[in-house]
Structures are given as structure tokens and as C-alpha cells.
């Protein structure tokens, strides 16, 4: 689908006309980080996982913003033939995009589930380190060499090997001299952690926070975000999980999502205090 002059690639599962579920990946990642999770919901939902611009098989832009990325989420949801407003599930950078989508398009988002996206004050040292880490992606001679070099940021002690191999393979594209990573290094041009802070009080749809036990959303940060959301958002810890919880604890993530979605289907939302 075309959004604001860029072609946005997405994958879809489930029958058109079912309630919608949209999965949004993190920074330097892509839609295939979600395939082994998203497909589990196809019997009840029309499911989509997109490549944000600057990632995966979507076009690159001259500049990037949360506002543009959330327009892409809404555009994919509309194009994928979902019944009514979808629930959006976002990890890391995708969690900030999910918050922006809920805040900017309240009439078009039914719910938001944010996975280990820590909203904090600006940290120039962290942002500089992240930009330098992803600057100038290397060209590798072949797929196997590149896949052997694949690492997440931050790194974790455990991953499911079958997931990592698929994710690594789908992260690469052919170029002169071999293969390189698909993402645009300039997507790391600003602080998403701090820019998301003002979004939280504006979210009016259902929202839930998933916190990885060994991730970046600490209990203190989770409590702060809970307060900013008017004390109506459950903060759910995924045990044993690192920041990239779909790579090391995918079954726990699927179970937590199924439980939450079943509750939302049969319950009345709390109102903000």
C-alpha cells in the first residue's frame, strides 16, 4: 500500500472481514520478526505485520517520524480489509509507533499493546551509541556469512534458533559485492523514548503494557507509564524474557496476547481517574 509517497510492504493472515490485529516491529527490524507469532491469531482475526518505511521491503524516506509511521499503520489496517478499528501490537520502536497511532487516530485504533517500549527522559549518550552501532551497515560476501554475524541490540543470553535463522535471513538484501542489511541507518535520527512521553495521556483506547523480565521497561518505568495512562493499563511481565521477547519467549508472548485479547473481548474498559 502507498502511504505519503512511500510503498509500504505488509503480510496478512486470516480471512478478510474479521476483526483486525496489526503487528509493528522494532528499530532496524522488519515484519518477519512477527511471523511466528502473528500467524497464531489468523483463526479469529485478520492479521497484518508491516515493514515500517526505512525497514524490510518498504521504501526509504528522506526523514522519519512517529507521526508518519503511525500513518503507515493506519494505512495498512485500512488496506488489509479488517472489520472495524484494529488492535495494534508494537515492540520497542514499534511500541512508540503504537502509542502514536492510538493518540493521533483515536477513532481508528480499538486497542494498543506495547511490548517493552520504555518511555524515559532523553538519553543523548544512549541515542548516540545506537546511531553509531547501526551506521554504515557492512556488506558481507554471502548469506551464510552475514547470518552468522546477525546480532540483536541489545544482545540476549537466549534465542529460539529457528526464529533467529528466519529473522536473520529475511533481514538481508543483495547488493554489489554480496549482501547487506535492509534497514536505512537514518531511522535512528531522534529520541523516540522521550518523544513518546507526551503521547501517553492522550491515549483513550484500551492499552496494555508488556514488560520483559530482563528487558528495558523496568518496574519503575512501567509504574511511571501506568500513572501517565491514568492507571487503567495493565502492566504484564513476561517471565524469563529479554527485550526481544518474541525471539526468546514466543509461546509466552502468544499466551499473554491471547489471554489479554480474550479479556478485552468480554469486559468493559476502566475509565481514567
PLM segments and residue spans:
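Flexible "cap/lid" loop of the alpha/beta hydrolase fold
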Residues: 99-103, 110-143
Amino acid at each position: 500500500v502507498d502511504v505519503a509517497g512511500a510503498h509500504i510492504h505488509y503480510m496478512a493472515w486470516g480471512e478478510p472481514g474479521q476483526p483486525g490485529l496489526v503487528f509493528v516491529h522494532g528499530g532496524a527490524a522488519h515484519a518477519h520478526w512477527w511471523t511466528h507469532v502473528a500467524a497464531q491469531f489468523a483463526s479469529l482475526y485478520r492479521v497484518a505485520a508491516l515493514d515500517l518505511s526505512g525497514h524490510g521491503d518498504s521504501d526509504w524516506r528522506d526523514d522519519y517520524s512517529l507521526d508518519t509511521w503511525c500513518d503507515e499503520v493506519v494505512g495498512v489496517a485500512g488496506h488489509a480489509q479488517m472489520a472495524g478499528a484494529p488492535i495494534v501490537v508494537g515492540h520497542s520502536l514499534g511500541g512508540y509507533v503504537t502509542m502514536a497511532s492510538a493518540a493521533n487516530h483515536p477513532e481508528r485504533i480499538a486497542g494498543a499493546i506495547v511490548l517493552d517500549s520504555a518511555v524515559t527522559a532523553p538519553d543523548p549518550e544512549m541515542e548516540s551509541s545506537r546511531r553509531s552501532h547501526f551506521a554504515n551497515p557492512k556488506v558481507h560476501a554471502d548469506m551464510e556469512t552475514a547470518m552468522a554475524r546477525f546480532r540483536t541490540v541489545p544482545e540476549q543470553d537466549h534465542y529460539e534458533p529457528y526464529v533467529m535463522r528466519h529473522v536473520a535471513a529475511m533481514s538481508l538484501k543483495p547488493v554489489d559485492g554480496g549482501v547487506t542489511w535492509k534497514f536505512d541507518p537514518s531511522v535512528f535520527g531522534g529520541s523516540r523514548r522521550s518523544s513518546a512521553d507526551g503521547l501517553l495521556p492522550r491515549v483513550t483506547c484500551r492499552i496494555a503494557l508488556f514488560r520483559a523480565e530482563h528487558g528495558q521497561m523496568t518496574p519503575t518505568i512501567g509504574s511511571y507509564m501506568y500513572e501517565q495512562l491514568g492507571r487503567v493499563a495493565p502492566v504484564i511481565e513476561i517471565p524469563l524474557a529479554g527485550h526481544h521477547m518474541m525471539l526468546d519467549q514466543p509461546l509466552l508472548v502468544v499466551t499473554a496476547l491471547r489471554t489479554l485479547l480474550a479479556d478485552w473481548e468480554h469486559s468493559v474498559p476502566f475509565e481514567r481517574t
